[in-house]
Amino acid sequence: MAVNRRNFVLGTLGVGALLVGVGAWLRPGDRGGLYSEYFRALNNELKAKGPMRPVLLIDLDRLDHNIDVVMRSVKRTGKHLRLVEKSLPSPGLLSYIGQRAGTQRLMSFHQPFLNHDAQVYPQSDILLGKPLPVRSAELFYQTHKGPFDPAKQLQWLIDNPERLQQYLALAQGLSTRMRINIELDVGLHRGGVSDLNVLGQMLALIAANPQHLEFAGFMGYDPFVGMGVPGMLGSPEELFAKVMVIYQRCVDFTRQQYPALWHDGLCLNTAGSPSYRMHENENLSSEVSVGTAMLKPTHYDLPSLVEHEPAAYIATPVLKSTGAVNIPALDDKSKLFSWWDANQRQTFFIYGGNWMAEFESPPGLQSNGVYGRSSNQEMVNGSNAVGLTVEDQVFLRPTQTEAVLLQFGDLLAVRGGKIVDSWPVYT
């Protein structure tokens, strides 16, 4: 626990100020409530069979629904689906989704995970999702073992001529051939090629070194299209049209200037969870990448993902229930907080805390900005209506998946409110 001095002062002064009549109408309403039937069943299951520590739950019924939503979109266009491994960082989870979706295409972002993927999924096709330092690529080759053939099954993402030169030198030193996918800046402005002259330099270098470099395609990542950009900057449709103009320009340039590099089997990757549905409206790309949309954390509550359902939750037990909020040094004066705010009339200390997550169930729970956050035993406040007791579970919904899923050890897969499997995460 770390008392936030600024919030402490503002909080105590604020309560005092609000006691006067001019602020009475601002008094918070009671936001508390009991578990829904869904979370009541999960609470009972975890109290009976769970480990009584913070866990990350994957709801397989909801995950199935999300996979099917994605696949209906993909099948309408005849494209392929590539799973974003960093957003689904568990071999069991990836395998489950891959089997239901019928795909062995992965996108990897981290050298240790890449080596793991190559060993565990020897039939997979892997595209790097970001350009790795050449030393990371070298470490991949040094530690790689198994039947996975990088020369045929791995695409290195390259963003500029300088990095391509480094990879060429590595390929020459290893006496191997590398498949090169070129990152395009289609409007995200996070690096990648945005100039045809630069693209020409890279394609020329690939064409001049066929023993060590092979052109594998393009990647144009466009999540901003579906992220709710203010309308004054362009509608999703307008932003999407601009993305595809840039992508098409790079494709046309390559076909015209380097026809020997072009063939039908190239990987023309695009999209991302917020924007994959938009690509039903184009036939240029060959595949879309999706990861986070399979689990739909809070930051992906977007109009473009309205058909998706939240499928991942943190569950953690209540360790202590101590009544009305009580702030160190304020002691009895803390009663002002609970008098003013019904949502501070119960205090719970949970196992762990301070995650990238938002309270989900029971409704009306909140962290305490005056007391401060804690990763050990976080104070959580609620009204009398929440009905929590010691060892009941507090449920939170992650704001994102790629970092959060790695923090809890094995994921617990649930179906129909029952624990049915556990899946280790990447390490």
Predicted feature descriptions by range:
Residues 83-228:
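Active-site-proximal beta-alpha core segment in soluble small-molecule metabolic enzymes
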Residues 12, 173, 179, 185-306:
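Active-site loop/helix belt of alpha/beta enzymes
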Residues 2-142, 423, 427:
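A charged N-terminal "starter" segment
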Residues 55-62, 85, 128, 132, ...:
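Catalytic cores of large soluble enzymes that bind and process phosphate-bearing ligands
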Residues 47-59, 124-127, 145-155, 229-241:
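Glycine-rich tight-turn/loop motif centered on a GG-T
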Residues 70, 167, 247:
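Aromatic/hydrophobic pocket-lining residues that form π-stacking "cages" and hydrophobic walls in ligand
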Residues 58-65, 88, 92, 162, ...:
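Conserved active-site and cofactor/substrate-binding residues in soluble primary-metabolism enzymes
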Residues 241-427:
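Active-site anion/phosphate-binding pocket segments in diverse small-molecule metabolic enzymes
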